[in-house]
Amino acid sequence: MNYSIDLADYGYNGECTPDVARVSAVHKERYGLITPFGMTYGFLKPGSYMLGDQPYPTAGDFVRIEFNPSGDSRIIETLPRRSLFSRMEAGPLMREQAVAANFDYVLLVTSLNHDFNPRRMERYLTVAFNSGASPVIVLTKADLCPDYQSKIAEMEISAPGVPVHAVSVYTGLGMDALGQYARPRATLVLLGSSGVGKSSLLNALAGSYEMRVNSTRDVDSSKGRHTTTHRQLIMLDSGAMVIDTPGMRELGMWCAGDGLDAAFPDVEAVLARGCRFSNCRHESEPGCAVRAALENGELDPERWRRYQALQAENRRSDERQALKRERQEHMKGIAMKRKELKRKGR
């Protein structure tokens, strides 16, 4: 069979072989796949993912498959990822939800209406930095905000060193600046709350209006509505790819890793100086670098408190994950012992 698609054009750096595909969409238990032979669908091979020793695929993943030219292919393995954006799944089960994988830029989208919240962006930046890709902040609906330049400056305070762009898909304002990220073979992921204009932004980047868009143009309306119902990867005319994701009502912290320090470089710079005592709680101890920075105005007290809140949330998440792993190992040990006893006929 001759190849009709070069997976290198879809960001794959390895050898293009018949058993490699990229996940283009996630529909519950069925996956859209880009293969060397064209677009198809696939499902997880029974048993391949049951033991939990490899991650379930998400949009943007490269996977190994058993290609079926006459029907759905079988996905047998998720290949190593170069970047991953994940969050805590909503609900009581405390599971990681992989949102997107193998991307170069995270476009954090928020609108210049009532959704505008630089403080909330710090949470998104923490997770984005930890993903392994470069975050970019996009402020949509700039045509509805006469003082959008001041909003850019306000956002830059909460996101030191991160590019911030104000755009309008209706007037074209700022759209050219996004072209530097949409280069051939690069993958971008769009993340943000419901109704901030991700689908409209994607349509503008793609030069078409294929996505269903629910208008939230009313400047007095702050309630966003989901216009994307599943995660999907779309090829642009520029040769770049965009992973669109459903709007997020909340972004639960799964693992901040080094992302917290990267999102708060001003705080990290103060902490790097070191306090007199290694176990300093940064409260009233003598020789505390943080207290000194707070008192001389170098460090903003509110920003320090938000850093502490995210740090505490991440610590609780780590502790819960460790406890869950311990329980899983315990249950696995019991299952193995029962299996051994059954084998011996006891």
PLM features: residue spans?
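N-terminal accessory targeting/assembly segments
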Residues: M1-P118
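Helix-rich effector regions associated with P-loop NTPase G domains
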Residues: G52-P69, L79-V99, S134-P135, A142, ...
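Short beta-strands and strand-loop turn motifs
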Residues: L107-T110, P135-L139
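Conserved ATPase-coupling elements of RecA-like P-loop NTPase cores
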Residues: N117-R119, P146-I152, G252-C255
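Histidine-anchored nucleotide/phosphate-binding helix
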Residues: R119-N130
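Canonical P-loop GTPase G-domain recognition
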Residues: S134, K141-V196
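Conserved active-site beta-strand-loop modules that form the wall/rim of enzyme catalytic pockets
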Residues: T187-V189, G195, S199-N203, Q232-L233, ...
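A conserved segment at the C-terminal end of the G1
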Residues: K198-N214
